[in-house]
């Protein structure tokens, strides 16, 4: 049974997951409908569709594993459920982080303007950057899956051994380290590009700060808003992996459901928060969402009149 604090946090986690799935579903559907209408898909549209779909899968895996750990922990130590969850998690989590890294790089190369020769070279070769990152993703999968299979097979072989109970936690840590090794590169690249874009926008805002004309004042507000979105993304992104680390530690520490659910809460903030950031930061997505909300409000008003 859960105490009141654990129950409240679990409700928060579930709400975050539902909002994240709804937000990503909306992003994916909007871009798919835009592609069906215009018969053309931009790089950003492709990345947003891939990011939304992969992140929906990641959220479901996080919630599934979280609920199993809270209510049915014995299921993770018996049968093949751990193996299935691990394989799906590695595939979807790597893919999700890869898509968000591509999105950050694309915005960075599109918006920022540095005189650095490396930056200028990258800006002229955006497609080459995507190909390189695709190669990194495939390499990450090729390195992770064989090693992960070996670890899981060793775990199965020793599971009936009584001494294995004490070693299982060490194997679990090794397993988690190996399966997440491939995404460290993408995480670092994503955070660096966000930080550099924030630096560029901050310098640009500071340069325009002395000019208070209408256009420049509006441009400054847009830049400040973009900086807030980027900082929010970085906070959510870091909290996501901090939460995952807490969840991993809870498998080797004495059982502490409150700490584990706290980790889940931090983990689910990113998919929920970033989907909202993407919707608010994209003009077309924002306008379409506002129209949808207005239509829902009108339908609700008409329904109230009919009841009366």
Swiss-Prot record:
<feature type="transmembrane region" description="Helical; Name=1">
    <location>
        <begin position="8"/>
        <end position="28"/>
    </location>
</feature>
<feature type="topological domain" description="Extracellular">
    <location>
        <begin position="1"/>
        <end position="7"/>
    </location>
</feature>
<feature type="transmembrane region" description="Helical; Name=7">
    <location>
        <begin position="259"/>
        <end position="279"/>
    </location>
</feature>
<feature type="glycosylation site" description="N-linked (GlcNAc...) asparagine">
    <location>
        <position position="80"/>
    </location>
</feature>
<feature type="transmembrane region" description="Helical; Name=6">
    <location>
        <begin position="233"/>
        <end position="253"/>
    </location>
</feature>
<feature type="transmembrane region" description="Helical; Name=2">
    <location>
        <begin position="44"/>
        <end position="64"/>
    </location>
</feature>
<feature type="transmembrane region" description="Helical; Name=4">
    <location>
        <begin position="126"/>
        <end position="146"/>
    </location>
</feature>
<feature type="glycosylation site" description="N-linked (GlcNAc...) asparagine">
    <location>
        <position position="175"/>
    </location>
</feature>
<feature type="topological domain" description="Cytoplasmic">
    <location>
        <begin position="29"/>
        <end position="43"/>
    </location>
</feature>
<dbReference type="GO" id="GO:0001580">
    <property type="term" value="P:detection of chemical stimulus involved in sensory perception of bitter taste"/>
</dbReference>
<feature type="transmembrane region" description="Helical; Name=5">
    <location>
        <begin position="181"/>
        <end position="201"/>
    </location>
</feature>
<feature type="topological domain" description="Cytoplasmic">
    <location>
        <begin position="202"/>
        <end position="232"/>
    </location>
</feature>
<feature type="topological domain" description="Extracellular">
    <location>
        <begin position="65"/>
        <end position="87"/>
    </location>
</feature>
<feature type="topological domain" description="Extracellular">
    <location>
        <begin position="254"/>
        <end position="258"/>
    </location>
</feature>
<dbReference type="Pfam" id="PF05296">
    <property type="entry name" value="TAS2R"/>
</dbReference>
<feature type="transmembrane region" description="Helical; Name=3">
    <location>
        <begin position="88"/>
        <end position="108"/>
    </location>
</feature>
<feature type="topological domain" description="Cytoplasmic">
    <location>
        <begin position="280"/>
        <end position="308"/>
    </location>
</feature>
<keyword id="KW-0807">Transducer</keyword>
<keyword id="KW-0675">Receptor</keyword>
<keyword id="KW-0325">Glycoprotein</keyword>
<feature type="glycosylation site" description="N-linked (GlcNAc...) asparagine">
    <location>
        <position position="161"/>
    </location>
</feature>
<keyword id="KW-0297">G-protein coupled receptor</keyword>
<dbReference type="GO" id="GO:0016020">
    <property type="term" value="C:membrane"/>
</dbReference>
<dbReference type="GO" id="GO:0033038">
    <property type="term" value="F:bitter taste receptor activity"/>
</dbReference>
<feature type="topological domain" description="Extracellular">
    <location>
        <begin position="147"/>
        <end position="180"/>
    </location>
</feature>
<dbReference type="GO" id="GO:0004930">
    <property type="term" value="F:G protein-coupled receptor activity"/>
</dbReference>
<keyword id="KW-1133">Transmembrane helix</keyword>
<comment type="similarity">
    <text>Belongs to the G-protein coupled receptor T2R family.</text>
</comment>
<protein>
    <recommendedName>
        <fullName>Taste receptor type 2 member 107</fullName>
    </recommendedName>
</protein>
<feature type="topological domain" description="Cytoplasmic">
    <location>
        <begin position="109"/>
        <end position="125"/>
    </location>
</feature>
<keyword id="KW-0472">Membrane</keyword>
<keyword id="KW-0716">Sensory transduction</keyword>
<comment type="function">
    <text>Putative taste receptor which may play a role in the perception of bitterness.</text>
</comment>
<dbReference type="InterPro" id="IPR007960">
    <property type="entry name" value="TAS2R"/>
</dbReference>
<keyword id="KW-0919">Taste</keyword>
<keyword id="KW-0812">Transmembrane</keyword>
